[in-house]
Each structure stands twice: as structure tokens, then as C-alpha cells.
Amino acid sequence: MGDTVVEPAPLKPTSEPTSGPPGNNGGSLLSVITEGVGELSVIDPEVAQKACQEVLEKVKLLRGGVAVSSRGTPLELVNGDGVDSEIRCLDDPPAQIREEEDEMGATVASGTAKGARRRRQNNSAKQSWLLRLFESKLFDISMAISYLYNSKEPGVQAYIGNRLFCFRNEDVDFYLPQLLNMYIHMDEDVGDAIKPYIVHRCRQSINFSLQCALLLGAYSSDMHISTQRHSRGTKLRKLILSDELKPAHRKRELPSLSPAPDTGLSPSKRTHQRSKSDATASISLSSNLKRTASNPKVENEDEELSSSTESIDNSFSSPVRLAPEREFIKSLMAIGKRLATLPTKEQKTQRLISELSLLNHKLPARVWLPTAGFDHHVVRVPHTQAVVLNSKDKAPYLIYVEVLECENFDTTSVPARIPENRIRSTRSVENLPECGITHEQRAGSFSTVPNYDNDDEAWSVDDIGELQVELPEVHTNSCDNISQFSVDSITSQESKEPVFIAAGDIRRRLSEQLAHTPTAFKRDPEDPSAVALKEPWQEKVRRIREGSPYGHLPNWRLLSVIVKCGDDLRQELLAFQVLKQLQSIWEQERVPLWIKPYKILVISADSGMIEPVVNAVSIHQVKKQSQLSLLDYFLQEHGSYTTEAFLSAQRNFVQSCAGYCLVCYLLQVKDRHNGNILLDAEGHIIHIDFGFILSSSPRNLGFETSAFKLTTEFVDVMGGLDGDMFNYYKMLMLQGLIAARKHMDKVVQIVEIMQQGSQLPCFHGSSTIRNLKERFHMSMTEEQLQLLVEQMVDGSMRSITTKLYDGFQYLTNGIM
């Protein structure tokens, strides 16, 4: 059994008839698992290997054969994966495994000792339990990741690698950092089990390819430079960037030899021009971007991409599909590095606006914003809306990005460029002038501009001869329809009976809304982001859309992103995953805690992008702009104590405060000054900046020794120590901790896997994981947990170190 070699390749379905997809035996499997759950955690590795070898027998038998998709069509297998977009999940175990108990009984010799017979029977039972667990509905992606990480048997690892194809893409994507970190830093068997799935998904999605390439580079940076160059992570990253993993139908396409309309070029000249432009896509713009010495390990990216584009140019194929996006990202990062050299916030803001104005000369292009959740093309960056955020040493900045949503990024043509002076604001179809743009005009819009030496072919953009303006669908009398709305038309969805609303209630609510309209912040040259962040998101979208030449298009969307240079966002990504997992746990357990995980894109070990929290400003900005206490600000924004708006905002504050207090305790989040705590328009608080978690603290000063930050101002908003909402806050803390410890393994494994091979400061010390587990207090009763929560709340509220750290931040950084 130990000599058997397991081939951890992707699933290659056989032509044998199958008994149905896994998990179809629902009831009986679940009952067996429930009865034997106490023994599942102690499974003999030898038994596990035998079980999974049997399950993977079909894979080994067909090594070198032609796989067949679930539709009956053959699949090409390149780099260990099929081209077809549909991969069939593992079938039920072969018949010999389902009948293993009978076979075991037949093979036991009559003269075998009773001890040996008992061992075989126990092994058979454990093997059956393991297989049934893997095939049951209880086996989710979290359990798959756990077995992949903890198992030492190639058979188990290969089986789990193939089972990844059965899970939803978004479920696996959540664990992508863990999968890639295991691929880089664990043994070959784990890597061989993971690679087929990664390769398959890279063929399907260009965004997945980008994320894999970025994460592989970032998580390989902790390795020694000589080891890194030859590591499996670097090789897979090169494979992705070389464009070998693009869909087969795209890879086989040749550039069209027919000239586009109005180009005035012969077919031969035009083909040569496109080929040159595409092949040099990754070189031209990056040639003038300043490199920083902060991360010399990744300076070979340009060389790798350059060599890959040369081979593509020689093979006369389509351009490297990731090259335009990588250039777009590098341009944004280069802007941040240049801003950091300027002394004042005002100079940084002016430079940012001018840099983004130049950037617009390259748009629209085949680029996208990776933090978005839908396919789109970037068409414009409203440069005057960008702001520099607060930072003492660096220059993170916030930009808004106009995009056009599309069904498929790869197959949809890049939108035509509409000049800024052609269309400003379109309120009706009649106001739309007939717009056309010639090829010469389009080329002019991508002409060489200052600070970008000879970069007019840096981003791959589809050649468009004539602009086609897509008109929105006309809805007649849409304004009149609003005025015709009446109370009589409001009906219950279930009973269809009229719903009567008291006129007094309507009048009272309207008067409350008019009396307590959210205040606007004054413009501060030292803090220009305050005004931009305070503006309601819907109002900002409306205003930018009216001033955009693309705003009349029905698929126009506005996105925002924070660009950070000089910061390692890998810890931020880890914190995002933990918050997302806790949010899911509390929803599953129906605990009304509120937290707001925001997306993180790790670009390298010292740069990245962050999804901004809209309709939110920091408590520091609130106190500085309003010169009010937190409670008085709530009263100003939401009305008096008895209004619906105030009571709703107060409840939101309590639920979010309790949620983030638990997060800060479990992850030991530090650097909790008022600049890192946001307050949104609905009363929630949102903690940001998780750069100091677990074993790390700012400058190792050790100021913050309390479990979490709970100031007297927070308690005042809750109604004081004797208020019902303060008791509600403590009850939520207890319920949230009880719910979290029920699912401790799901949280701990996220952190534990990322510690593998990592040099991040949050993992310094050998007791990081042990201390994390201890904070779940698995051995305590609920009564003991309640006492613990009382002690933590009391200690945090009276903590002198919290006050000292706030004072330190005020003296050194001016944070109130």
C-alpha cells in the first residue's frame, strides 16, 4: 500500500457508468457520520491513504488517456487541466469500495489471530467513515482546506484537490490565499493536488489569473532570493504571465488581416502595427516608471513580461491578456510613489489631479478594477474628485473610476472613447448630439503626454473606426408617474389589501428628515479627504454621472478604490478573511452583530488596493470638523433621543461596536486611534487598518493593553452604564463569543495556514496560534464566559493605556 503512487491530476472521467453525484446518499451517510463523529478526528493515516487510493483508481487507470467532459465531449489536457469550462465532480466511490466490508471478511484467513482481525475491522470502519464524510453534504470547502493542510497522505491530498472542482467558484476564491500559500511553502504532494484547479480557473477567468499572479509574487517574497527564483510559486506565476493559460479559442486566433474602417492603412501595414503595439504593451509604459528599492525581489517582473511578449510577437498571436491591466496597476502605483516625495498635502493633491488627468489619455482600455464584483471596462477617472488620504509618511489616495459593465470582459469590445468636450450631461435622448470619432481622432487621444515617454501604445485597446453612442431606453412620462403615486396604490404583497398610513406619521417623519439633514464638512487643505468622504454616495454618483461624457450610457457604473504604496497589505487580507468568516458565523447563528469587511487586493509585498467604505468618515474627522462630542454629533445628525432616526442609529452603533470589540479581542488588533475608526451615515462604526494584529504592535510600544477600545464617549452614545442599550451591548458580546467558539476551527485555520513560511510581523513568536485558540475559551461554561465579558468590558472602559495612546496620537499626529 505504501508503494502505490497516487497521480494527483485533475479528474479524468471514465466511460464507466456512475451511480450519481457525490452526496446523493444523504440520510444514511449523515447518520453514520453522526454516530462516529467522535472517532473521525483520529483517523489512521494508513487507512486514509488506502481509502483515497481506491477512490482515485479511475484517475490512475486513465493516465495518458483522453478525458471526457460531462457533456460527452473530449477535453484537451494541458498543464494538468482541461480546456473545457465544465469539470465533472468526482463520482461515487467504485463498487469495490462500497463492498469493502464483504471483501475484508473474505480475505481474512481462518488462522489469523483475533487481534489482527479486530484491527482490520476497525480500519475498515474508519475507512468507511472517512469516505462517507468526503462524500457527504457536510463536507464543505472549509473542511476540504483543513484536510488538505493537515493530511500527510498523497492520496487524501489528491482526492481533495479533485474535490475542489465541485465547490462554487466564490467559495474556493475565499481561500485562494491559503491555497497559494500551501502551494508555495508546503511539500510537492500538496502543490500537485492544488495546481490542476488553479490552472483550470486561470483558463476561465482573467481576473482569477491576475489575482493568482499577484498573490504568488507577494507570498514568494518571504523566501530567500536564490530559492525564490526556482520555487514552484515563481514557476506557476511565470506560466500565468506567459499567457499560456488563456482560453484555447483565444490562443489559436490570429490577428485579422482586414483593415478597420477609415484607417487608411493597407492590410499588411495594419497587421504589423497591431502586432508591434500588442507585443510592446508591457514595456512602453513601464519604461518610465520609477522603481523603488523597497522590494527588489520583484524587480524581475518587467524582464519576465518582456521575454514573454517577445515570444508572442514572434509567434504572431494575440497580445498578452494581462499586460494592459498590469500596466494600469503599475501606473497607479507609480503615482503614489511620486506623491510621497512631496512635502505638503496641498501639493500632493494638485499633483494627483494632474497625474490622473494624464492617465485619462489612455482610457478607455482593456483594463478593469480588480476589487469590483462584476465584469467591466474602465473608461474614465474623474481626476478632480480624487483626494489624498491622511498618512504621515506615505501618500495613499482615493480615486473614483467610471466603468461600463459588460457580460464578458474577454469577448466584449473596449468601449469607444468619447471626448470630454463632446458630451457633458445628458438628461434626455433629444439632448444627445450625433457624435462620431475618426481613427485619427482616436489615435490623438492616446498621443504622447508628459511624464509618460512614448507610451501611446502601452495599453491594448481595440481599434474603433466610428463611435457608436448607445442610447438609453426611453420611458415616457416617467416624471409624471412619480407624481401620480398615491397611498391608495400601496398594497400588501400577500393580501393585496390597501395599507393605510396616518397622515400625522408621514408629516412627523418628513419634518424629522428636513430638520436633521446630514451636515457637510468644510474644506480643509490639511485634510482634503474629509469633504469627499462625507458626501453621500448616491449624491456623488449623480454629480459625477452628470459631468461624464459616458454618463448617459445605461451600463455606466461608478467605483472607488484606495491605492496604497509602501504598505504590506497581506495582514490586511488576513484580517479581511477572519472578519468575513466571523460575519458568516454570526449570520448562521443568528447573532445580530454588525461588521463591514472590505475587499483587499494585494499587489506586492509593499503595495495594494483597498475597497473604500462609502458614506463614512473617521471619528477624528468628526471631532475635528464638528468640535462636538460623539453623542452631540449623533444628536445633530440623527435628531433628539426619542426620534426614530436616533434610536435606529444608536442600535446600529451598539451592534457594530460589539462586533468590532470581539474582532479586536480575538485578533488583538492594535493602533486603535480615532483615525482608524470610521462612523457611517447610519450610525455604525467600522474599524480600518489592520496592520497590527496578533503578535505585532506599533513600534512595539505596548501602549494598548486592554482587550479592545471602549471609551466613555462610546458608552455615552449607548445611553450610559445603566442604560438598556449598554446591557444589550454586553449581551451581544456574550452571544457573539459563544457563537464564534462553536466554529473556532474555521477561524483558526485561516490564520494557521498563512503562518506557513511567512515572515509577517503578526506571526513573530512561536505562540501566536496557541494564544489565538486560548482566546476562544473552549473550556469555559457560559456563566464563566459571561463573567469574562463583564471583566473585559469593565477593564477596557477604565483602561489608562487607551487614554495614553490616544494622547500619544494627538501629540505626534494631531489625531483627536
From Swiss-Prot:
GO CC annotation terms, alphabetical: Golgi membrane; mitochondrial outer membrane; rough endoplasmic reticulum membrane
Keyword terms, alphabetized: Acetylation, ATP-binding, Endoplasmic reticulum, Golgi apparatus, Kinase, Lipid metabolism, Membrane, Mitochondrion, Mitochondrion outer membrane, Nucleotide-binding, Phosphoprotein, Transferase
Region G-loop, residue ranges: 541-547
Main location: membrane
Residue ranges annotated for the PIK helical domain, each copy included: 52-242
One example GO MF annotation: ATP binding
InterPro entries: Kinase-like_dom_sf, PI3/4_kinase_cat_dom, PI3/4_kinase_cat_sf, PI3/4_kinase_CS, PI3K_accessory_dom, PI4KB-PIK1_PIK, PI_Kinase
Task performed by this protein: Phosphorylates phosphatidylinositol (PI) in the first committed step in the production of the second messenger inositol-1,4,5,-trisphosphate (PIP). May regulate Golgi disintegration/reorganization during mitosis, possibly via its phosphorylation. Involved in Golgi-to-plasma membrane trafficking. May play an important role in the inner ear development.
PI3K/PI4K catalytic domain residues: 535-801
Reaction(s) the record says it catalyses: a 1,2-diacyl-sn-glycero-3-phospho-(1D-myo-inositol) + ATP = a 1,2-diacyl-sn-glycero-3-phospho-(1D-myo-inositol 4-phosphate) + ADP + H(+)
Subcellular location: Endomembrane system; Mitochondrion outer membrane; Rough endoplasmic reticulum membrane; Golgi apparatus
Residue spans of biased composition, Polar residues class: 278-297, 306-318
Residues annotated with N-acetylglycine modification: 2
Example of a GO biological process term: phosphatidylinositol-mediated signaling
CDD domains to which the protein is assigned, alphabetical: PI4KB_NTD, PI4Kc_III_beta
Domain of life: Eukaryota
Residues recorded as bearing Phosphoserine in the entry: 258, 266, 275, 277, 284, 294, 428, 511
Recorded topology in the membrane: Peripheral membrane protein
Protein name stated in the entry: Phosphatidylinositol 4-kinase beta
Annotated stretches, region: Catalytic loop: 668-676
Keyword match Endoplasmic reticulum: yes
ATP-binding among keywords: yes
SMART domains the UniProt entry points to: PI3Kc (SM00146)
PTM annotation (Phosphothreonine): residues: 263, 438, 517, 519
Residue ranges of the region described as Activation loop: 687-711
Chain residue ranges for the region called Disordered: 1-29, 101-120, 248-318
